[in-house]
């Protein structure tokens, strides 16, 4: 099992796309949050969904989003989970895999802001101030700790093609995955 972490807009989804092309099954913790938020009638606005995620963590524990996402795991050996936000979530995923590997994706705030604006998801931020607010919220959840403890770090500071190549190299060399899958 590979669990991916990184600040918003760092490139986690792109890492997952490469992993999927190599035969991994992908799960997205953010999709789980958005699904539960929608069912609770929460508007598709970044700070509303973020507040909902925080509220659920306070009610049910810091690992609640891991608990809810893990229900969808079908093959722990070939699963990539996108969106690790804290150590408690990592501990929970350890129940499904003896040694889940943490891959952290890093990109500058400037690059992340530009990418977020381009992807144009309905619940995304629209201003630098909103990104700073979101970064602060995610840091309060403990994301900095899991980034610091990552087994592998990929820097996303170049073209998309270069980043994909870095992802493919890590997956094929460290996880013995064939480039031909």
Swiss-Prot record:
Which terms does the record give in the GO molecular function aspect?
ATP binding
The UniProt entry, under InterPro entries, shows: NTP_hydrolase-rel, P-loop_NTPase
Q: Which UniProt keywords apply?
A: ATP-binding, Nucleotide-binding
Task: Report if keyword Oxidoreductase is assigned.
Answer: no
**Binding residues annotated for ATP, in chain numbering:** 6-13
* Superkingdom to which the source organism belongs: Archaea
Pfam families assigned to the protein according to its UniProt record, in alphabetical order: AAA_17
| UniProt-listed HAMAP family | UPF0200
Give the family this protein belongs to, as stated in its UniProt record.
Belongs to the UPF0200 family.
**Protein name, per record:** UPF0200 protein Ta0179
């Amino acid at each position: 099992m590979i669990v991916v972490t990184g600040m918003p807009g760092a490139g986690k989804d792109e890492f997952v796309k490469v992993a999927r092309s190599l035969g991994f099954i992908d799960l997205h913790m953010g999709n789980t949050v958005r699904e539960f938020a929608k069912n609770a009638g929460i508007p598709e606005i970044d700070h509303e969904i973020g507040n909902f995620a925080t509220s659920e963590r306070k009610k049910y524990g810091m690992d609640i989003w891991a608990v809810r996402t893990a229900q969808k795991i079908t093959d722990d050996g070939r699963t990539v989970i996108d969106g690790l936000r804290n150590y408690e979530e990592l501990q929970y995923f350890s129940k499904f895999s003896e040694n889940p590997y943490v891959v952290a994706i890093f990109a500058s705030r400037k690059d992340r802001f530009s990418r977020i604006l381009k992807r144009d998801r309905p619940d995304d931020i629209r201003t630098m101030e909103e990104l700073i607010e979101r970064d602060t919220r995610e840091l309060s959840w403990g994301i900095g700790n899991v980034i610091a403890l990552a087994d592998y770090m990929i820097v996303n500071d170049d073209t998309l093609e270069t980043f994909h190549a870095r992802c493919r190299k890590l997956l094929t060399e460290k996880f013995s995955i064939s480039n031909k899958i």
